[in-house]
């Protein structure tokens, strides 16, 4: 019951506020009428599972490491959220046998054509790299097939964040082609060890296709700057927040793969490109400019400047009326959450619960003090708070555009130099050709 209520609240409201955009693509590939195991990469604690399952038509179930269930209050809420404990060797060998009960519960759900989100890496790491897959997911799938004859389908899911611990950023979720556990059952009868290995190879291959991977950590900075430039080449609808297209992920995947390629084949080309990118962003910083402004060459935008002026009263009202639920989660997370893997999950959890108490309380106070008129005015508080987010974006964008045009009037040669550097970088990136006939992973 609690999980259904949160599914009604979090995807359409909480996610709309926390994420600037969500790209949720290729769900049509998933056979929703089958028992399903969604096998995703793991970057962002509890957030990953919630994102994968939020837009599925049926209830979603999760696995979480058992040490999160030690507290009785936490255990109650996790169970209400359809979360099952999984005991790892890290929790002690004496506890691993408890997974038998967990697996029985999982099989019971799968028998009803239910589903589970699992993270085969077994560890949450905020890197653009996959970790070695563990065998728990494979054992779960083979167990369901062996004991109950279930045609479990495994769906690799790529989860890619622009910045996983930051507010108003983006996340890209893409579903890979599923495979049936029955495809590996004959091998399992002959050699369970080989079947487990083959299972992980299938999942890993799917994840490698869906996840944006930077193989060499030394290239993280370079890839990130190129991703910023790639994103800024495209203007998306301003108010739209959910997209079904996979084009954005493919763009970012291609950029990362090109750097992976020249890291392996041409260190000279890599060093040259890195030097150009570094010079370009140093020029931007020195002149207090942003790549977005250079890329889009925005005009003066009289209407947007007018919206900044006319929208200011709405901004003040919306900001002040939503200040507590906006500031408190951030303050708590900044003070107490030192591990960034948990930052956004805690932020969203606190923010959602707080607003569920805050908003009715404000309506009650407004109604008692000002009657029905103020009560109905109070109903606009969430909308004004949402508009504040866009107002802030417009103000920042207008300020950056103003600085750009001011610089262009004062020093057109400098702007031309910066634009030339950007074009050189994009041309150099374009010249790197991937072999589309083979897997570059």
Where are these regions (language model features)?
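Basic/hydrophobic alpha-helical interface regions
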Residues: 20, 54-60, 103, 132
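Flexible internal linker/loop segments at domain or repeat junctions
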Residues: 292, 296-297, 327-345
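Alpha-helical bilayer-embedded segments of polytopic membrane proteins, i.e.
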Residues: 303-327, 342-393
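Non-catalytic C-terminal accessory region of glycerolipid acyltransferases
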Residues: 2, 95-298, 376, 380-441
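A conditional alpha-helix N-cap/helix-loop micro-motif detector
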Residues: 20, 42, 96-100
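Catalytic core of membrane glycerolipid acyltransferases/transacylases, capturing the structured
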Residues: 2-8, 30-94, 325, 329-338
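Membrane-interface elements of multi-pass transporters and channels
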Residues: 21, 214, 331-340, 368-372, ...
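A short, well-structured juxtamembrane/interface segment
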Residues: 13-34, 428-440
């Amino acid at each position: 019951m609690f999980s259904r209520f949160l599914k009604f609240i979090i995807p359409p409201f909480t996610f709309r506020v926390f994420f600037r955009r969500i790209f949720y693509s290729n769900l049509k590939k998933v056979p929703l009428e089958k028992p399903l195991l969604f096998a995703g990469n793991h970057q962002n604690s509890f957030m990953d599972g919630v994102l994968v399952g939020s837009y599925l038509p049926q209830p979603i179930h999760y696995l979480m490491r058992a040490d999160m269930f030690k507290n009785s209050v936490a255990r109650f809420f996790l169970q209400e959220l359809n979360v099952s404990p999984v005991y790892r060797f890290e929790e002690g060998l004496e506890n691993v046998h408890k997974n038998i009960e967990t697996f029985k519960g999982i099989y019971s759900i799968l028998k009803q054509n239910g589903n589970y989100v699992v993270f085969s890496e077994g560890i949450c790491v905020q890197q653009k790299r996959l970790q070695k897959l563990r065998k728990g997911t494979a054992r779960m799938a083979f167990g369901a097939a062996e004991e109950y004859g279930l045609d479990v389908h495994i769906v690799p899911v790529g989860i890619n964040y622009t910045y996983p611990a930051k507010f108003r950023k983006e996340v890209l979720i893409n579903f890979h082609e599923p495979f049936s556990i029955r495809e590996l059952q004959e091998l399992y009868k002959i050699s369970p060890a080989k079947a487990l290995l083959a299972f992980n190879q299938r999942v890993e291959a799917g994840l490698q296709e869906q996840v944006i991977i930077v193989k060499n950590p030394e290239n993280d900075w370079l890839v990130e700057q190129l991703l910023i430039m790639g994103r800024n080449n495209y203007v998306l609808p301003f108010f739209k927040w959910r997209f079904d297209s996979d084009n954005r992920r493919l763009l970012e995947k291609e950029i990362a793969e090109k750097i992976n390629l020249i890291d392996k084949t041409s260190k000279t080309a890599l060093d040259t490109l890195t030097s150009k990118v570094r010079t370009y962003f140093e020029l931007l910083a020195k002149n207090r400019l942003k790549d977005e402004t250079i890329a889009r060459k925005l005009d003066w935008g009289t209407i947007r400047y007018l919206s900044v002026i006319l929208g200011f009263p709405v901004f003040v009202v919306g900001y002040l009326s939503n200040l507590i639920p906006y500031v408190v989660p951030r303050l708590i997370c900044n003070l107490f959450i030192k591990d960034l893997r948990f930052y956004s999950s805690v932020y969203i959890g606190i923010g959602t619960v707080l607003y569920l108490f805050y908003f009715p309380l404000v309506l009650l106070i407004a109604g008692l003090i000002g009657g029905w008129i103020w009560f109905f005015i109070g109903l606009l508080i969430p909308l004004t708070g949402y508009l504040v987010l866009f107002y802030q974006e417009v103000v920042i964008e207008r300020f950056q555009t103003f600085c750009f045009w001011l610089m262009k009037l004062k020093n057109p040669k400098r702007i031309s130099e910066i634009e030339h550097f950007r074009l050189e970088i994009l041309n150099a990136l374009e010249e790197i050709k991937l072999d589309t006939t083979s897997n570059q992973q």
